[in-house]
Regions:
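Short coil/turn connectors at secondary-structure junctions
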Residues: 69-73, 98-102, 123-127, 149-154, ...
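Short alpha-helical segments and helix-capping/turn motifs at coil-helix boundaries
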Residues: 56-65, 139-143, 199-203, 294-298
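Conserved acidic/glycine
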Residues: 1-109, 119, 252, 256, ...
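General beta-strand structural signal in soluble alpha/beta enzymes
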Residues: 76-77, 106, 129-130, 156-158, ...
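Thiamine diphosphate
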Residues: 81-179, 197-200, 207-367
Length: 367
């Protein structure tokens, strides 16, 4: 058996050495991206032409660029392709009759999809990504945990990330899910706020060879907040100052995803009252936690709440946010199940408006 195996391997090595695609094969098996691959030009095009779209749509737009220029990707969805926006860039389905396809229709098999992607990532040569609703991560959590444990580069495209999905109601509206996923070691959980952050998050996920990524994406459209070019991938630091206070700073608003634009509205109202407010986009808590102490202190100075009040805003559980707001800070969130109604009505009902949040901040400052 050993002799046969040795002979077969030698024959395979000889074929590989003579093959014209040897370098490409070895690059892909090593998990390296092509040297020419970059999303910089695409991101600049987003900055040049701002648009209001859901981040699930922003992800589809980015995937159009990725799949057209990176042959390593193989996508799919657990029976929600049209909702997850995961099929883009001209890729066709992978079938028994056509194995050149790069898209898999997994059916209603969330755990099977996640487990299959783990296998593909561990084999090497491809970068698998797959989509479902964020609330359905409960169905594939064990496989997501193994992605992290086995250091597998898998990208989970999890859409409909909050009460913003609307009428499907509390069975489909994530509350505790984002924070519970953040608790898994070696798993990046990213919640981008607009088209630019979404593209940045995809770029990070593709370059993370030894850990998986969850992209938490909206159903509802979001305004584009990033309209100026940056010298680096700002999302790569996990969090960054999107807006600096104009008046003397009294408040730091820390928000994620769809609530970042709300934080900018709150900041504008506070400024009218002479209260300066920074807006920090917390794209990925894990990446932020990995930054050096100097950067973290620059963004979240270690001063008393009497000097600077920290406020977190996320349309999910408030559990865990005291890590960033400190115990005397203010945490805006949802600690109950959602409801069935249009997204705008739900955000108003659950207090996710500047009119509801700013008075809470003022009371805290004056308390």
């Amino acid at each position: 058996t050993a002799e046969r195996g040795s002979a077969a391997r030698a024959e395979w090595r000889n074929r590989l050495e003579a093959h014209g695609d040897k370098a490409e094969f070895e690059r892909r098996m090593a998990g390296d991206l092509p040297e020419s691959f970059s999303l910089d030009t695409y991101i600049q095009s987003l900055i040049d032409e701002p648009q209001k779209v859901a981040t699930r749509k922003a992800s589809e737009m980015t995937l159009g660029e990725i799949n057209a220029n990176l042959p390593d990707t193989i996508g799919g969805s657990a029976d929600l392709t049209g909702s997850n926006n995961t099929k883009a860039g001209g890729i066709g389905p992978f079938t028994a009759d056509d194995r050149s396809g790069r898209y898999i229709y997994y059916g209603i098999r969330e755990f099977g999809m996640a487990a299959a992607m783990n296998g593909m990532a561990l084999h090497g040569g491809v970068i698998p990504y797959g989509g479902t609703f964020l609330v359905f991560t409960d169905y594939c959590r064990a496989a997501i945990r193994l992605s992290a444990l086995q250091q597998a580069r898998v990208v989970y495209v999890m859409t409909h990330d909050s009460i913003g999905l609307g009428e499907d109601g509390p069975t489909h509206q994530p509350i505790e899910h984002i924070q519970s996923l953040r608790m898994i070691p070696n798993l990046l959980v990213m919640r981008p706020a607009d088209t630019v952050e979404t593209a940045e998050c995809w770029d990070i996920a593709l370059r993370e060879k030894d850990r998986p990524t969850v992209l938490a994406l909206t159903r509802q459209g979001l305004p584009q907040l990033r309209t100026e070019a940056a010298s680096e991938n700002l999302s790569g630091r996990g969090a960054y100052r999107l807006k600096a206070a104009e008046s003397p700073r009294r408040v730091i608003l820390i928000a994620t995803g769809s609530e970042v634009s709300l934080a900018t509205e709150c900041a504008a109202e506070l400024e009218k009252a002479g209260i300066g407010a920074d807006v920090v986009s917390m794209v990925c808590t894990q990446l932020f936690d990995e930054q050096d102490d100097a950067y973290k202190a620059e963004l979240l100075p270690d001063v008393s709440p009497d000097e600077t009040l920290r406020v977190s805003i996320e349309a999910g559980t408030t559990f865990g946010w005291d890590r960033y707001t400190m115990t005397k800070g203010l945490r805006i969130g949802i600690d109950r199940f959602g409801a069935s109604a249009p997204a705008g009505d739900l955000f108003e009902k659950f207090g996710f408006t500047a009119d509801a949040i700013v008075p809470q901040i003022m009371n805290k400052l004056n308390g």
